[in-house]
Amino acid sequence: MKKNEIMSKTKIVCTIGPASESKEMLTKLVKAGMNVMRLNFSHGTHEEHEEKINTLLEINKELSTNVAILLDTKGPEIRTGDFVGGKTSFKKGQTSVICVEDIVGTSERFTITYKDLYKDVKPGGFILVNDGQVELLVDHVEGTDIVCICANDGIVKNKRGINVPGIKLGFDYLSEKDIGDLTFGCQQGVDFIAASFVRRPQDVLDVKKLLIENGRPEIQIIAKIENSEGVENMDEILKVADGIMVARGDLGVEIPAEDVPLIQKELINKCRAAGKIVITATQMLDSMQENPRPTRAEVSDVANAIYDGTDAIMLSGESAQGKYPVEAVETMTKIALKTEGTLDYASLQRKAIRTASLDQSEAICMSVAEIASKFNVAAIVAFTDSGFTARKMSRYRTKSMIIAATPNEQTTRALAINWGVKSVLCKQMDTRAAMIEYAQVIAKENLVEPGEQIIVTAGTPGVAGTTSYLELITVK
């Protein structure tokens, strides 16, 4: 195989914003290696997001690609109100009061979007403003006012984020905005929901219920772990979510920054064991917002996330508003390809086998992985309606590429985050002979040479969630 022409197995998620929303730039990002377009619904109107979605669908059609759409919710975040002059200066030792009235505030007295915070906080706790740039120590609660002492100097602009570490907040998970955004996403055909600030399993179930009510139960829900309560409940959250995003920005404010690498590894390991997708996000190539080359620490960060076992790596400001969005994607692709070339695939496979469940589908996928390793097969062609077989195979981290052949266009995009999987749209294959014939065609289209071996695997036609067949063949 001409391996220098293969795209990375690790998937790349790109946040789309002013720097990348034109058709020309989106096309360049797709060609550079973008697998998933992330739309951040904390910003922008439905009309603006719809335009981006339609543009991507046009590009997918023109390039015969399957780039997926991820809707990232605003979530139940807390923000400051506005300040006189658009910003305010906090001084160490000053008294600062957080109130419920909607005022244009100053550092002495300002409002926030969550009006019941006074019911949740306790004296001695911290309220962190603007990603922890300003720390407010809660002194006491006076009626509905939270009286704080400022722990450091800092400048805060309008509508900055508020974090309250260690406090279980009392608000409902789904806001009216999120409900409207999720309903819009269902209508627009998005493939993934990144649910922000998930604290408990019920938050995911609330999103799932809304998707079902809107006729889109197949949309996969990625729970963003970005607060201490989410970390505490990660095992239960993982049981009901389709995957996890390690959202290191807010997480690094809510918990000690030195704990974030450990939590990242723990979340990735748990997702790998459960066969759930995992995205590592935030500040991966942050300096490339301004510079054409990453720092060496950033390169190591991306590589180490891949060594940890992440399915996908994500760009935020780098691709949304940075000066070098295409270069950032190209850099991620280069790092991923280099890192994947040094992975210990045998060790990864053994680890997957140790944590595998015992059922027929798992046994078939396990056998496929072992045969692929022993015979050094060029590709695994998985025929799948729902994506089940390809997702199962991805868990085993085979060195061989996994080609998911499906008659379902939605499934081609639903597999966009799964590590090592390339999806292609095909007609329904109901016989073994048809599958064997088509497998050879798409293998050669994906740079498999005549004489190389491939494995063909499939489930029972028309029955989702099964994998019951495998065959080793030589490409003619």
Each model region followed by its residue ranges:
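Non-catalytic helical/linker scaffolds that mediate oligomerization, partner binding
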Residues: 1-476
